[in-house]
A protein has these predicted regions:
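Amphipathic alpha-helical assembly/interaction segments
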Residues: 1-103
Length: 103
C-alpha cells in the first residue's frame, strides 16, 4: 500500500470514527452534565478526521506535522471523555468499548 492509498483509507476510517462518536454521544443521558460532555466529545471526536484530512492537503511538511499533532491531541481528549463516560456507567460497555479501542 502506498502513502496515498494509506492516507485515503485513514481519512475514511477517521470519518467513520467521527460518525461513531456522534452516534455514541446520542446515547448519553439528557442531563446538564451529560450535555456538556456530549458537546466536548463530539467536537474532539469529529476534529480528529477533519485535521487529518487537512494534514493530507497541507502545503508543507511543517504544516503536515502540525495538523497530525492536532489530530493526536484531539484523539487523546476524546479518549479522556470516553473514559469519563465509562467511569460514570452512562453507556453500556459493549457499546462503548469498541469506540474506546478505535480511539
Amino acid at each position: 500500500m502506498d502513502n496515498k492509498e494509506f492516507a485515503k483509507k485513514l481519512e475514511f476510517r477517521t470519518r467513520q470514527f467521527g460518525i461513531s462518536i456522534i452516534k455514541t454521544s446520542s446515547l448519553l443521558p439528557q442531563t446538564l452534565e451529560a450535555k456538556v460532555i456530549k458537546n466536548q466529545i463530539t467536537k474532539s471526536g469529529t476534529s480528529i478526521g477533519a485535521n487529518y484530512r487537512e494534514a493530507n492537503r497541507s502545503r508543507s511538511q511543517r504544516d503536515f506535522k502540525n495538523k497530525i499533532k492536532i489530530s493526536e491531541s484531539e484523539a487523546s481528549e476524546t479518549e479522556y471523555w470516553l473514559e469519563i463516560i465509562k467511569d460514570l456507567n452512562w453507556i453500556e460497555n459493549e457499546k462503548l468499548n469498541p469506540v474506546i479501542k478505535e480511539t
